[in-house]
């Protein structure tokens, strides 16, 4: 987490800036209908307000991760927009295809956060390749390399409890973003106002403008072929008549698993 949103005035007294930030959110015309009732519910609760607004989620090599909800210290569409604007500012300095791949898991609001990130990138003139359904992290890594993207975004909180969600960033090699790149993105995030600083267009607008496209079957087929090529004993399950029971414990898989057997 970053520095507290608190400063000392010229008399040395601590000014609780988090209260001002809370009031700004409370007065704002928030697009996510879930946030305003949540903010109203904590009015007058200084401990709760401080927990949500005295600090902000910090972007690092593992991206962001936090509890869903209203505030700078929570995962919501505004924190996602802010983070994506920081990433977009970095991508625009990298040349190349100016493209970012996006995937997401089945956690609460993962699809919303993924489309929100796509809208910020598109508003910055950056092309997006996003999966049309939830796919696991390796699929995001593969798409990042397949389309020769500058970066990849995976909306997931890995093994954390259901109340969490997260935002992971990957480099052009499909691996976790390096320390140096993450530090630059974090600096750009710090320059971006969480409520108003990010450029943004709707997902539908991005699709209409041709900036947002879904990951194609060519990429998916290449992914499955790459996995199948690494089988130690191809076709063993089918020839042996084995029946497999699969449970997705970490929220990140779906239909793709039916094909890889």
Which stretches of residues belong to each language-model region?
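Short, Lys/Arg-enriched N-terminal segments with co-localized hydrophobic residues
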Residues: 3-16
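Gly/Ser/Thr-enriched, mixed-charge loops and adjacent short helices
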Residues: 48-53, 57, 165-253
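Residues on a specific face of well-ordered alpha-helices
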Residues: 85, 115, 119, 138, ...
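Generic, well-ordered alpha-helical scaffold segments in large soluble proteins
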Residues: 86-90, 120, 124, 143, ...
């Amino acid at each position: 987490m970053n520095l507290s949103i608190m400063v000392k005035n010229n008399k040395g007294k601590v000014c609780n800036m988090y209260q001002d930030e809370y009031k700004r959110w409370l007065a704002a015309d928030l697009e996510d209908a879930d946030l305003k009732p949540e903010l109203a519910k904590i009015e007058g609760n200084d401990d709760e307000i401080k927990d949500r607004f005295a600090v902000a989620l910090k972007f690092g090599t593992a991206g962001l991760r936090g509890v869903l909800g209203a505030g700078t210290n929570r995962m919501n569409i505004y924190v996602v927009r802010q983070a994506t604007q920081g990433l977009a500012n970095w991508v625009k300095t990298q040349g190349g295809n100016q493209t970012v791949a996006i995937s997401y898991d089945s956690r609460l609001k993962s699809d919303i956060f993924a489309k929100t990130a796509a809208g910020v990138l598109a508003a910055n003139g950056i092309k997006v390749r996003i999966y049309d359904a939830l796919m696991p992290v390796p699929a995001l890594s593969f798409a990042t390399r397949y389309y020769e993207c500058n970066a990849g975004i995976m909306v997931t909180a890995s093994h954390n409890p259901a109340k969490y969600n997260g935002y992971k960033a990957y480099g052009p090699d499909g691996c976790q973003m390096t320390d140096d790149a993450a530090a630059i993105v974090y600096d750009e995030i710090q320059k971006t106002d969480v409520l108003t600083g990010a450029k943004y267009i709707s997902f539908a607008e991005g699709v209409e403008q041709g900036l947002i496209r879904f990951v194609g079957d060519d990429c998916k087929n290449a992914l499955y072929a790459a996995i199948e090529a690494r089988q130690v004993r191809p076709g063993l399950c089918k020839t042996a008549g084995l029946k497999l029971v699969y449970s997705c414990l970490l929220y990140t898989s779906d239909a793709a698993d039916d094909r890889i057997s």
